Curated annotation (Swiss-Prot):
Signal peptide from the UniProt entry: none
Gene Ontology CC terms: cytoplasm; small ribosomal subunit
Organism of origin: Photobacterium profundum (strain SS9)
Listed GO MF terms: structural constituent of ribosome
GO annotation (BP), single: translation
Superkingdom field: Bacteria
Keywords per UniProt: Ribonucleoprotein, Ribosomal protein
Keyword Ribosomal protein among UniProt keywords: yes
Protein name (database record): Small ribosomal subunit protein bS16
KW Ribosomal protein (keyword) present: yes
High-level lineage: Bacteria, Pseudomonadati, Pseudomonadota, Gammaproteobacteria, Vibrionales
Family annotation (SUPFAM superfamilies): Ribosomal protein S16
Similarity remark: Belongs to the bacterial ribosomal protein bS16 family.
Length: 83
């Protein structure tokens, strides 16, 4: 099954997440099908906190991809900011 979820990158105590489309059987930070955005929880000042390609999200959800809980909240936030 294909899922849209977060893959952790960054350094120790400084998380940075890629929002990826991946097979649910693959490891969290393992192989992915497509990178569709990023999330920086520690963004300060003018740094971008969230970037997400909503067209690609809709494409993958239309094909039957499931969305993780945290990613669903981020998609909702990105859609609100885009409107």
């Amino acid at each position: 099954m294909v899922t849209i979820r977060l893959a952790r990158h960054g350094a120790k105590k400084r998380p940075f997440y890629q929002i990826v489309v991946a097979d649910s059987r693959c490891a969290r930070d393992g192989r992915n099908i497509e990178k569709i955005g990023f999330f920086n929880p520690l963004a300060k000042g003018q740094e971008e906190r969230l970037r997400l390609d909503l067209d690609r999200v809709n494409h993958w959800v239309g094909l039957g991809a499931t969305v993780s809980d945290r990613t669903a909240k981020l998609i909702k936030d990105a859609a609100k900011a885009a409107a």
